[in-house]
């Protein structure tokens, strides 16, 4: 891919700033200015089963929510049926399990799809979920031309942060382009892709990296669509106009507002210069937002309400760069699964912003602001340069390893700033004194998932398989494989497969046979090493070296593993980087490992400690399984301590310790350097106690 011309954004007039965000003539509000319509109000939700989630959606819609945002469980996201060994402990945990068309019918029962705007956070299996959605809409009699919504479908960012990829980049891009070209012809009001900056920020991206990498990902997709030749030249602008974005908003209010204005300006320029889009409405940067969930604090979590409010303002105050849809996390997401009441609190926050304040009654209040103009231009200029760096490497696909290592390095820098106190987090590293919170009730403050839900979903799956026409399902799967081997668009055959009773895992396995699977780079090996000069880190290095000497080892060896399907690798990567900096020899093989693979690696690598990271809620089943398999491989957790990190309620942590876990860490344990010293101490204590 050719790079764009480098340098400053010369198209920005020096007298009135960036175009189109700050070009403005007239008063802030005319006498007859109508109040703007609010953004789509959504709550990201789904758990346990399709029927339970359907009931939740209907309650939220009755409370004033204006669109759906569907969270799928990890087996659905990664293409496994509920009875697959890799799905154990993960079914219905972080979202709703959708194993077949019957589940999709139950999920959408009583919700008229021709009147609903539905966002589906789904990527590797996005085509399959869209196929089932369209099949249900057809059954409802809803015209495909009237379906509105979004499939996230940004697989490139999955390689960089979220981790729910399946196939290699080439076939994954093919699935995306098939969805885009199908959408242009069949579901023209549907956004076939949400290019995501959200997860990049959580993975460590600076505002400049967030803008640059996201736009580079969008270029990779649009260039691939253009290369298919399936979209007539005169229709390509409308295809560009259906590309939407999913962004993040952090607490640096002015910087975040300026970042969104930079996004708006650069997308306008990019679509005009690279793709020749003349109609301004097709160059519009259309984006939805969820504010920063992983930035919420576990200590004094009630303060998160203020964080969420400020982050929401950053993407709603500026009319020229206002979000089209907004979903806000619950205040206690850093601690466990929020209750419906917690989600309602965030929903009411949106409604207060939209209906009680006057922010929708004015033109853009930042027009003419020299401060915002300057910050916007700074981000835009630097992002344009960084985007060219990526394009010069062959584009986003060719630069995956570069972008991943840059994100890991940026997150490590951010983590060190928090630990040193350079970056203040109220209630975490400063102002930690607190009164007891009336909201802090371990037994009552989280949603309780039904422990039998996984068994019921497996029974549901078995019943579905037993009642379908097996020959029709097999024939439909053959058609999927044939289309994958050729150049036929895969969406129509996927819709037919859904109607024939094919399951999520069967559809994904058919494509695995043709496309193969992929392991993304971890970025850990390329992250910059923290040099001498930090007293706490130097002290821990000395402790680690001392323990190694006393137990007769050249170096302490740590295995960092992520069992199950949880792809949120940021924490594991930072633990691996800090362990390396503290003097450990680190074995880190990436995400989505089976308990057996972790246990086998612990034995083969002759490690001194095993660290497990789980954020999906599957710890209760997966961790004991790892312990049992370690013992089967001759690795005694009493001699090789196992430590676990994640969003783990104290009651669960106590059970894990009873099962043989040496220590449990949660987001409250933010100081990784101190943690490394504690882990070294656990290794020495285990060595002493076992001789």
Question: What positions do the PLM features span?
Answer:
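Acidic/polar, glycine-rich intrinsically disordered N-terminal extensions of enzymes
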Residues: 1-103, 107-114, 137-142, 385-391, ...
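Catalytic alpha/beta active-site cores
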Residues: 1-256, 274-277, 281-290, 322-329, ...
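Conserved, mostly hydrophobic/aromatic
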Residues: 64, 100, 141, 267, ...
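Short beta-alpha connecting loops at secondary-structure transitions
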Residues: 88-93, 118, 157-167, 200-204, ...
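Phosphate/diphosphate-binding loops
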Residues: 99, 122-125, 163-183, 264, ...
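Active-site-adjacent beta->alpha loops and helix N-cap segments on the catalytic face
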Residues: 126, 130, 594-596, 618-627, ...
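Flexible, glycine/charged-enriched surface loops at secondary-structure junctions
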Residues: 144-147, 190-192, 228-240, 271-285, ...
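Flexible glycine/proline-rich, aromatic-decorated loop/lid segments
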Residues: 236-239, 277-291, 299-332, 338-359, ...
